[in-house]
């Protein structure tokens, strides 16, 4: 077996262990990212993993490319003949007179496709397997961590180049263009994938002054105002001014894997209260880092951060402002930006070695902007390791 094949086998084995625990007979993978994770190919189709026996990737397009890429056996997909083909290739699951329990990640499955699957497989009982896939993908392998380290290195190099362009009068979008071009030349895909329905995200945000405090639909503390209501997030044409906070939040996708980082910059000098708030963001980061270790409930870093924000007298500004505050401190990240674990109240599951996640303590001040920091980490056997390479500091640039 090749290294890729061994990786796919290990992932499939973990999926099957979770299926056995839930008495699932077969798992239908439909989301492009899930299909890639388990097959090694992101061609359009449905990968079916039986609890026993050979998995098969039924491909709509392109069968030719899937045959070259997929670790699973590939077959052309036709929903008209799907039931017959499933019975032929997986008789232990799809035998006549049996009511198999089938799972799919409902959070990433269109109603239209689900209805067609129900029509094609009328005898099946369906169950939501969203949590199953999230659990399996939450713990990263050595190969995945290698891709994440490459991503972090590319982001750091691009950020350093982008920093050289920041000066009074330059537009947010021009800074973002420098950073994005530098990342693209180094292997960034140009996209970051999100699992959340109806969500999309640009490569990054450069948000200066009040742009950093502009609320929007995106489930994050700072999104930028963007160009237009049709894209209400990201950098804008607004010119950077002296003595205002500039938040640079960038994601970089290398070999499919995303890292996320944020730094706060000022040309000149920040107001004293904003400098103090930034100091609290770093303090929250340091305290939360201590809690990134195996066995700690996902919610604990969030609850500790909220307590510190309260002590600072800044709770109304923490992770957004007022009704637009988000209710998390960090998020899992990998092939998608919004993976497990979620550092938020109510998530009592324990952290495990190999989980990759962000911490992003940020404070938002309406009409003035946002300050804060974000890094990507991996949970280790004894604590955590910061994958982000960029130095943790408030970046102060001279007026020129």
Label the predicted regions.
Residues 1-400:
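Active-site neighborhoods and metal-handling regions in enzymes and metal-associated proteins
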């Amino acid at each position: 077996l090749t290294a890729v094949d061994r990786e796919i086998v290990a992932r499939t084995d973990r999926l099957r262990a979770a299926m056995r625990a839930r008495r699932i007979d077969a798992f239908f993978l439909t989301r492009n990212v899930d299909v890639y994770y388990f097959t090694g190919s992101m061609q359009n189709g449905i990968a079916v993993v039986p609890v026993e026996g050979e998995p098969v990737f039924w491909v709509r397009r392109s069968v030719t490319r899937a045959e070259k890429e997929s670790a699973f056996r590939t077959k052309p997909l036709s929903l008209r003949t799907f039931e017959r083909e499933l019975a032929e290739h997986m008789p232990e699951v799809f035998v006549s007179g049996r009511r198999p329990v089938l799972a799919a990640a409902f959070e990433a499955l269109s109603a239209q496709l689900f209805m067609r699957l129900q029509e094609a497989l009328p005898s099946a009982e369906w169950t939501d397997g969203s949590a199953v896939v999230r659990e399996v993908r939450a713990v990263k392998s050595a190969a995945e961590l290698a891709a994440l380290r490459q991503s972090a290195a590319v982001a750091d190099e691009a950020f350093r180049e982008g920093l050289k362009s920041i000066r009074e009068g330059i537009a947010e979008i021009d800074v973002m263009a420098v950073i994005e071009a530098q990342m693209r030349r180094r292997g960034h895909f140009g996209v970051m994938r999100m699992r959340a329905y109806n969500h999309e995200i640009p490569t990054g945000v450069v948000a200066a002054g009040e742009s950093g405090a502009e609320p929007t639909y995106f489930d994050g503390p700072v999104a930028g105002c963007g160009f237009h209501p049709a894209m209400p997030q990201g950098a804008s044409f607004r010119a950077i001014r002296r003595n205002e906070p500039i938040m640079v939040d960038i994601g970089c996708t290398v070999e499919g894997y995303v890292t996320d980082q944020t730094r706060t910059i000022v040309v000149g000098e920040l107001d004293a209260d904003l400098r103090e708030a930034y100091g609290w963001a770093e303090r929250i980061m340091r305290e939360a880092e201590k809690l990134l270790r195996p066995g700690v409930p996902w919610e604990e870093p969030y609850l500790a951060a909220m307590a510190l924000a309260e002590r600072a007298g800044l709770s109304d500004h923490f992770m957004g402002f007022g009704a637009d505050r988000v209710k998390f401190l960090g998020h899992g990240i990998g092939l998608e930006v919004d993976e497990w674990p979620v550092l938020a109240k109510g998530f009592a599951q324990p952290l495990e070695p190999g989980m990759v996640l962000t911490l992003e303590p940020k404070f938002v001040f309406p009409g003035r902007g946002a300050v804060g920091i974000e890094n990507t980490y991996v949970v280790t056997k004894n604590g955590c390791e910061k994958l982000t390479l960029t130095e943790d500091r408030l970046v102060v640039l001279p007026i020129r």
